[in-house]
Swiss-Prot record:
Annotated family: Belongs to the SPATS2 family.
Entry protein name: SPATS2-like protein
A GO term from the CC aspect: nucleoplasm
Organism: Homo sapiens
Coiled-coil regions, chain positions: 271-344
Keywords on record: Acetylation, Coiled coil, Cytoplasm, Nucleus, Phosphoprotein
Organism lineage: Eukaryota, Metazoa, Chordata, Craniata, Vertebrata
Protein's cellular compartments: Cytoplasm; Nucleus, Nucleolus
Listed PANTHER family: SPATS2-LIKE PROTEIN, SPERMATOGENESIS-ASSOCIATED SERINE-RICH PROTEIN 2-RELATED
UniProt feature, compositional bias: Basic and acidic residues: 80-92, 513-522
Basic residues composition-biased segments: 63-79, 469-485
An MF annotation (GO) of this entry: RNA binding
InterPro entries tied to this protein: SPATS2-like (IPR009816), UBA-like_sf (IPR009060)
UniProt-annotated stretches for the region Disordered: 63-134, 157-201, 380-525
Gene: SPATS2L
Amino acid sequence: MAELNTHVNVKEKIYAVRSVVPNKSNNEIVLVLQQFDFNVDKAVQAFVDGSAIQVLKEWNMTGKKKNNKRKRSKSKQHQGNKDAKDKVERPEAGPLQPQPPQIQNGPMNGCEKDSSSTDSANEKPALIPREKKISILEEPSKALRGVTEGNRLLQQKLSLDGNPKPIHGTTERSDGLQWSAEQPCNPSKPKAKTSPVKSNTPAAHLEIKPDELAKKRGPNIEKSVKDLQRCTVSLTRYRVMIKEEVDSSVKKIKAAFAELHNCIIDKEVSLMAEMDKVKEEAMEILTARQKKAEELKRLTDLASQMAEMQLAELRAEIKHFVSERKYDEELGKAARFSCDIEQLKAQIMLCGEITHPKNNYSSRTPCSSLLPLLNAHAATSGKQSNFSRKSSTHNKPSEGKAANPKMVSSLPSTADPSHQTMPANKQNGSSNQRRRFNPQYHNNRLNGPAKSQGSGNEAEPLGKGNSRHEHRRQPHNGFRPKNKGGAKNQEASLGMKTPEAPAHSEKPRRRQHAADTSEARPFRGSVGRVSQCNLCPTRIEVSTDAAVLSVPAVTLVA
């Protein structure tokens, strides 16, 4: 019952301190109360003065030391389980002891409870106050497990002052407390107890490695990189500001000249109205003068009836009227509008001013050690840009090259019959000579081109098949060596008989030479030229060589 009362008193004291200091956590209040022996006034004064931060820092430092001691003296604590059991069984005088030892002894006592479950029945009454104590201490133990978060927040605030060590201490202490709470009860495995402590050290080293890498990168380069990043970000902001300023200036210019335009229009309207008034005034003056002249004219008509005095007065009036005619002239010639346009133009040209940006930036010559790096970077960037340009330009010729082999492959396909027929004609020259003396063959040869000419006139060249072109080329190519052979035989036979034969033989030679040159052209030209050169000579040679072929046929048969 005493322990329950003390627990209730602790809660009341925590609430009392929290009512004065509402922004502090229960963990911090418990630690400060334990430091001042649960004196509420001293704890509140410590929070108000700010000395509670130092108290919490001391708690963290002592927790680190106790954690280290606990790591080193695990075996000693297992040996002194009986002493700890006796301490737990005693009624607790007050919660003046620090809580980390209580948590440390809690699982130890729990282990002894399990180990002493086989004891005699006279020990069972002793277990009842211990269970009460465990139930009482459950909430403070949870509070101490939650101390780590509060301490981490405090130490993060303190780390800004340049003390990162307490943060590491709190983490080690919290890890040690949780590990001791979850520790198995078997004392015969000390290696398993120390393994979680060893596993914390590589994590600490891994956390330090990025800082070490940053230090290796350069002692002060990180600050420079941050400054450069801020400056580059501000450049985009200034660019937006310039655009906004230019837009606002354009709007101001439009507004100013619109106002000037409105002012000019208003002035024009006022001047036009004033000119109308001037016109009316001048006309009134002239009408008055006109009436005066008419009146004087009427008086002059009555001069015969007037006395001398009246005539003298009339002459004086007329003289005065005539003497004022110069004013009439001035009234007619006077310029009613005058304006110094040049001055106004000068004022308009001087109206408004635009401030141009000043390039106050200075170029700093880089150090000689940085020049190779800058040149290499510029060279690599230039190569990449050139490579991108070349790759973009080579895409189109590659397509043309991909299409050209098809055209090239079509050239041999169309010219293959001529290539194939020429060696065949050279090898089988004797057979061709034998075959050309067949009258049926000559009739077919002479009639075939005529038919082909008729069919060519009826249908378009695009409608003709490749087989028809090949059929025309083969007899045409086989027909040329016959002309050559016929010319040679003609020279041999008619050279001795008649002198007229050489004249006939020169004509086939010229035609043969023209045909040979036409055969060589298709290999250099396009496909269209091949078909044209193979078709046109057939139509010419068949009609002209018919008479020439009859001469060797007669001579050789004889």
